[in-house]
């Protein structure tokens, strides 16, 4: 007996077979994705990126693979205004150079004294020299002449004498060992009197120097009320040149050098800068920590005059003669 072929059942069977094949393939793909999923690296801000890259293309026309940039931050002053600032490279050795360096037993002087200069042909007649062999850093020649000329004009006196500068005089009137004398940035003052050479105390008419020295960049290095910070007793005759804006800031805030170098660290190129106007000139000052044993990229203004001094501790102090702003002393 002949059976009739059931095409309906055949179609259903084929459909089931096809669904079974697709189901098996779907399961296979899912298992592959599960066991071969690429790990992800979380980035700042919550975004992510795969740690694998399909391909890396060399820049066209270079002829060689590029070297990845160093990830070490050598500026130590990230976040500064790139519209106003650029950077200059400073080796770590220059931390020990400049008028703001702290020199003592903990921070010895590392300079060579190559910038010392004599007063030959540069000294005016408003002050005296103990001997013509005295030398100072060349930066002091003009402010010393200017300060004593103004002092002489104000008081009529011309008997202030430079007793010593960059050397220690064992057995002399000022025989206290002061390591910073090596820098050439300091002077010991005395008075030429009828009965010989006397100590400078800053009394009477000579108080003009005590009151006005900061206008010429000088400070009394070891005040009597700063012994705990400086480690030395008061020296009324010993003056240090730190440049005009720093001398003014130290006087305004009643700071000795040790305290000032700590205080100025709060001022940065990316934040607030210390600001002061002296003799009609507006200055901004900020601190940049040095990269230990490496070159530091120090932010400096693109359009304003500036100077950089190390502190002999671990950083640089930038002084900007700015064309904007203004603040009274």
Q: What spans do the regions from the language model cover?
A:
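Extracytoplasmic cell-surface/polysaccharide-interacting catalytic and binding patches
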Residues: 2-235, 239-329
């Amino acid at each position: 007996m002949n059976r009739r072929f059931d095409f309906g059942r055949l179609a259903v069977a084929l459909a089931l077979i096809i669904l079974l094949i697709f189901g098996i393939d779907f399961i296979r793909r899912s298992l592959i994705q599960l066991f071969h999923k690429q790990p992800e690296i979380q980035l700042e801000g919550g975004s992510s990126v795969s740690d694998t890259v399909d391909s890396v293309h060399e820049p066209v026309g270079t002829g060689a693979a590029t070297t990845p940039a160093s990830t070490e931050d050598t500026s130590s002053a990230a976040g500064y205004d790139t519209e106003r600032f650029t950077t200059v490279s400073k080796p770590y050795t220059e931390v020990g150079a400049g008028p703001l360096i702290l020199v003592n037993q903990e921070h010895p002087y590392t300079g060579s004294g190559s910038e010392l200069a004599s007063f030959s042909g540069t000294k005016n007649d408003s002050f005296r020299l103990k001997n013509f062999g005295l030398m100072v850093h060349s930066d002091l020649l003009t402010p010393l002449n200017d300060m004593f000329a103004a002092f002489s004009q104000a008081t009529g006196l011309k008997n202030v004498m430079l007793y010593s500068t960059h050397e220690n005089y064992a057995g002399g009137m000022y025989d206290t060992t002061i390591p910073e004398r090596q820098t050439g940035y300091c002077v010991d003052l005395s008075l030429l009197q009828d009965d010989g050479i006397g100590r400078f105390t800053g009394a009477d008419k000579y108080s003009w120097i005590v009151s006005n020295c900061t206008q010429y960049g000088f400070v009394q290095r070891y005040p009597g009320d700063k012994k705990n910070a400086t480690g030395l007793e008061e020296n009324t005759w010993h003056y240090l040149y730190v440049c005009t804006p720093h001398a003014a800031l130290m006087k305004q805030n009643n700071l000795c050098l040790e305290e000032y170098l700590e205080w100025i660290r709060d001022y940065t190129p990316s934040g607030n800068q210390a600001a002061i106007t002296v003799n009609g000139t507006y200055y901004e000052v900020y601190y940049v920590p040095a990269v230990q044993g490496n070159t530091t990229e120090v932010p400096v203004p693109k359009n304003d005059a500036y100077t950089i001094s190390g502190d002999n501790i671990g950083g640089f102090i930038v002084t900007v003669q700015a064309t904007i702003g203004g603040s009274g002393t």
